[in-house]
Amino acid sequence: MLLSLSNYGKSIKVPREQYSSPYSVEYSFTIDDLVGDIVDSPRGAVSIQAAIPYDEWYSSKTLSRYGSWGPRSRHYSKPSAMDSWSVEKCRERVIAVGLLFKGYPYQHHHIPDWEHPESWPWKPVSSGKRGKGLDCSNFTSFVYNLAFGLKFTSDVSKQSAIGDATGPGPGTNKWIVKRIPLPEKYEDQIKVLRTGDLVFSFKKGSKSIGHAFIWVGRIGKSPDDTPLFLDSGGGATPDCNGIYVPDGVYLRPYRKKYWPYTHVSHAIRFFYSKENRKNLSTE
């Protein structure tokens, strides 16, 4: 174990495989209701994550076109039962789909299960290892795509400015999203944010957007009642037990003195009213 200092006192780093998160989620729906159509169907297959066939993932053409990022994501179809889902079910599905990738490392990739061949270029990350994984905005983009067939840019700066997403499913349909200004006060932000919102923070010392994460909201459970978010981030956040959350996809605490809050910009909401989409209740 490696001891180090954080903003919250002494915290401990442990290997990823030894980390046990104190955070959890309690859904209003069963896991099967939320993600059964993914885990029990071809939709959840690793081999179809990319826009190109699986046997081309590691081809010289892919190397030439995408370099260290690997192939881009496919555009998933609209889930067959989506029109019957409530706002709350859609919001909770965002979290449930995101947590299917819990423990995936932080990597600058377009899809979660693509791994660098040793001979390919690699953009170094905090984990210091090659392997599968996603960075923050490729994670948020992939989650909404897999969950609903809603596709939007994975560039974090451009993602923070979207007014719509393409979908559900491939084609020309557009899904209008809502930009949510966030109050300055921490407690007021908690009241405004909703489960599944995309939230964006500025880079430290800059007015450029540097991070994207997903708000967990009321379904998040923390021993100290700290609100939670879900992201693919670096390993610089200690949990409530003083253990650093590893880099990659994990639940993390939204603390007053932590960068995502101190540098927060705004949120984007995908599910919010009947005007937003048919058959969804208002809130």
Q: What residue spans do the PLM features occupy?
A:
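Residue-level marker of positions within ordered structural domains that often coincide
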Residues: 103, 144-145, 204, 218, ...
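N-terminal capping segments
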Residues: 13-155, 279-283
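Hydrophobic h-region of N-terminal signal peptides that target proteins for export
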Residues: 1-7
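Boundary at the C-terminal end of the N-terminal hydrophobic targeting segment
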Residues: 9-11
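Short, solvent-exposed coil/turn linker segments
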Residues: 30, 50-53, 62, 155, ...
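Low-complexity, Gly/Ser/Thr/Pro-rich intrinsically disordered linker/tail segments
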Residues: 228, 232, 244-283
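Mature, folded catalytic cores of secreted/periplasmic enzymes
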Residues: 84, 88-103, 107-122, 175-187, ...
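...with weaker cross-activation on analogous glycine-rich loops/strands in unrelated enzymes
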Residues: 150-243
